[in-house]
Curated annotation (Swiss-Prot):
One of its GO terms (biological process) is bacterial-type flagellum assembly. Interacts with translational regulator CsrA and flagellin(s). This is Flagellar assembly factor FliW. It comes from Shouchella clausii (strain KSM-K16). Belongs to the FliW family. Keywords: Bacterial flagellum biogenesis, Chaperone, Cytoplasm, Translation regulation.
Amino acid sequence: MQLETSYLGTVKYKQEDIIVFQGGLPGFPEETEFILLPFNEQPPFYILQSVRTKEIGFVCINPFLFWPDYEVELADSVVRQLSAESEQDVAIFVFLTIQQPFSKSTANLRAPIAVHAKKRFAKQLMLDGERYSLKAPIHTAGKGGR
C-alpha cells in the first residue's frame, strides 16, 4: 500500500506495519491507525504518521538514547491493554517539537508513547508528577534534561 505524508512524501507500507491506538491519541480521537517511519532513514528520529490523514505526523525518538536515566513504569493495566506479556514487550517513544535552530527543539518526556512492537498496539501515557518535562530541551539531553 502507499501513503502520502507531509514529511516524507509517498511511502510504501504493509498492513502489518499499522500500529493501532485504541481511542486514538489525545486531541486526535479519530486517528487510531499510524505507522512508524524512520525520518530520512536516519534513526534515532522517526515519524509517527497517521494512515488516515496526510497532515498528521509526529516526530519522535527513543528517549533512552538521549536520556539514559529516563524511566517509565508501565501499570499492569497498560501492559494488558497493549496485549503484552511484560514491560519488555513494549518500546517507548516521545514526541519532539521541532524548532529552528534545531538546538531549541524539545521532547515531551511526560507523555510517552508505549508501543507493543509485535502486536502493534499503542497508547500514549501521562506520567504522574513533575519529574519529567513536557518541553525537555534536546540540547540538555544526556545531562539530566528533565
